[in-house]
Amino acid sequence: MKLKIKKLDELAIIPFYAHKGDAGLDLFSIDESTINPGESKLIHTGISIELPSGTEAQIRPRSGLALKHQITVLNTPGTIDETYRGEIGIILINHGKNSFQVTKRMKIAQMVITSVLSVKVEEVNQLSTTQRDINGFGSTGT
């Protein structure tokens, strides 16, 4: 299966897997920007993609940025649909107490390619019951 990638900016880095067997391809910034505490910013990657049929790309945070700087992807996971051809942008948010400096060519997120199931939607008057039924939000303990 192939993922086609188009560079939109000379600073762009083609995403790659850091290690064999990794689920996520590293994504890189082409921007320099300061994200202040409590602030979110759209960071550009300078790439667009053409996904294989029946797939989506999920944009996920990098664990190191989250642990060390409290920087994460705001709309986790961000979804890139198979038919989208625009630039991939990453919305980063600073949950920390200090300003964070995004630099050009910094690893800012990861992209996981996964299969998508399409379903036929059917409106019904009643759903089947289960042992769990409507219990949620901590109903199995905290």
UniProtKB/Swiss-Prot annotation:
Q: What residues does substrate bind to?
A: R62, S63, G64, N75, T79, I80, D81
Q: Name one GO molecular function term.
A: dUTP diphosphatase activity
The cross-references to SUPFAM superfamilies, in alphabetical order and at most eight, read: dUTPase-like (SSF51283)
Keyword Hydrolase in record: yes
Return any one Pfam family short name.
dUTPase
**UniProt signal peptide:** none
Q: What is its EC number?
A: 3.6.1.23
Q: In which pathway does it act?
A: Pyrimidine metabolism; dUMP biosynthesis; dUMP from dCTP (dUTP route): step 2/2
Q: Which Gene3D superfamilies match?
A: 2.70.40.10
Q: What does this protein need as cofactor?
A: Mg(2+)
Q: List the disulfide bonds.
A: none
List the keywords (alphabetical).
Answer: Hydrolase, Magnesium, Metal-binding, Nucleotide metabolism
PANTHER family linked to this entry: DEOXYURIDINE 5'-TRIPHOSPHATE NUCLEOTIDOHYDROLASE
Function of the protein: This enzyme is involved in nucleotide metabolism: it produces dUMP, the immediate precursor of thymidine nucleotides and it decreases the intracellular concentration of dUTP so that uracil cannot be incorporated into DNA.
Q: What is this protein called?
A: Deoxyuridine 5'-triphosphate nucleotidohydrolase
- From what organism does this protein derive? Trichodesmium erythraeum (strain IMS101)
Source lineage: Bacteria, Bacillati, Cyanobacteriota, Cyanophyceae, Oscillatoriophycideae
Task: Please name the gene that encodes this protein.
Answer: dut
